[in-house]
Amino acid sequence: MDPMESSSEQDIVEESQKLVDSLDKLRVSAASSSSNFKKKPIIIIVVGMAGSGKTSFLHRLVCHTFDSKSHGYVVNLDPAVMSLPFGANIDIRDTVKYKEVMKQYNLGPNGGILTSLNLFATKFDEVVSVIEKRADQLDYVLVDTPGQIEIFTWSASGAIITEAFASTFPTVVTYVVDTPRSSSPITFMSNMLYACSILYKTRLPLVLAFNKTDVADHKFALEWMEDFEVFQAAIQSDNSYTATLANSLSLSLYEFYRNIRSVGVSAISGAGMDGFFKAIEASAEEYMETYKADLDMRKADKERLEEERKKHEMEKLRKDMESSQGGTVVLNTGLKDRDATEKMMLEEDDEDFQVEDEEDSDDAIDEDDEDDETKHYYL
C-alpha cells in the first residue's frame, strides 16, 4: 500500500473519531443547556439548491437587518466560496483551508467541502459559546451553508451544527426556491419533496422563500400549494410516469403545505423582506411552543435510555459478583487460558522427551545383545 494512501486513511479515521467526540460533547452540553436556553437571537439557517440565489438572498438579509436597525450576526459555513458579498463574523475559511484539505486527503471538490465541514464541526461548541456571550446584543444569526445542499442537510456534521444551534437558540430553516425554474410542475414538486425531507429530518420550523420574484411572480406556486386541483390541471397535459407520480404526490403533500410558511422575495430588489421576517418571527414562536417541547421530550428520552443502560450494566455486574461469591470477577480470561495452554504444551513436550529417551535406551540394549550374540558365534 502507498504510504501516502495509508496516511490519508489514518487521517480520515482520526477525523471521524473527532467528529464522534464532538457530537458527544455537543449532546452533553445540549443536555445541560436546557435551563440556559435563550429566546434570542433567532438562528436562520439558509439552505437551497445550487443556483437558487441563496448567497445573494443572505446578502439581502444582511442589508435588511442593517437598514432596520436590527442586530445581525453572520456565520459562513461554505469553505469553497471564493468571495462573499457580505462580511462574515465567523467564517469557516478562517479555520479550515479548503484546498489544503483536498491535497492532504486526496479528495475531489465535494469531498473537500464535506471534510472541511466535518473538521469545523469538531470545534462547533466554541462557535455556540461565542454567540452565547453576545446573545443579549443580537436579534438574528444568519447562517450561510454550502451550495451543494446535500453536503449540509444529509451529513453528520450538518446534523451536529443544526442540533447545536437548536438546543440553545430558537432555530428556523429557510429553504430558498428558484421561482422561475419551479414554474414547471415537475420541478416544483421536486423542490417540495426536498423541502419536506428537510422538515422531517431537522424537525425544525421551515420557511419557503420563493426567490427571484423580480423575474417571475410566485403566485402560481402558492395556488398550487393551496389547491391541488389547480396543480393537477397544470400537469394534466403531461401523460408521463413522472407527471402521474407528481399528480398523486400533490394530494399527499397537502398536509405538508398547511404547516409551512411561504413568502415571495427578491434578493436583487429586496421585495418581500418584511414579509419574510414576519414569517421568521412567527416560526420562532412556533418553535418555542411546539418544537422546543418536542426537543425537551427527546432529550428526556435519551437521558432515560442512558439511565436504563447504566442500571442494566450495574445489575449485570452485581450478578457477576454474587456468582463469584465475592471473588474477583475475571473480565478477560485470555491470559489465564493462554497460561493453561502453555502449561499443557510443556507437559506434552516432557512426555515426548521421556518416550524418546526410553526408545534410545532400548535401542542401546538391543545393540549390546547383538554384539554378544556375534561374539558368541565367532567363538
From Swiss-Prot:
**Record-linked InterPro entries:** Gpn (IPR004130), Gpn1/Npa3/XAB1 (IPR030230), P-loop_NTPase (IPR027417)
| Annotated Acidic residues bias | 347-372
The residues annotated as site (Stabilizes the phosphate intermediate) are: 110
One cellular component (GO) term of this entry = nucleus
Tell me the compartments it is located in: Cytoplasm; Nucleus; Cytoplasm, Cytoskeleton, Spindle; Cytoplasm, Cytoskeleton, Phragmoplast
Summarize subunit and interaction data from the UniProt record for this chain.
Heterodimer with QQT1.
Q: What is this protein called?
A: GPN-loop GTPase QQT2
What organism is this sequence from? Arabidopsis thaliana
* Gene field: QQT2
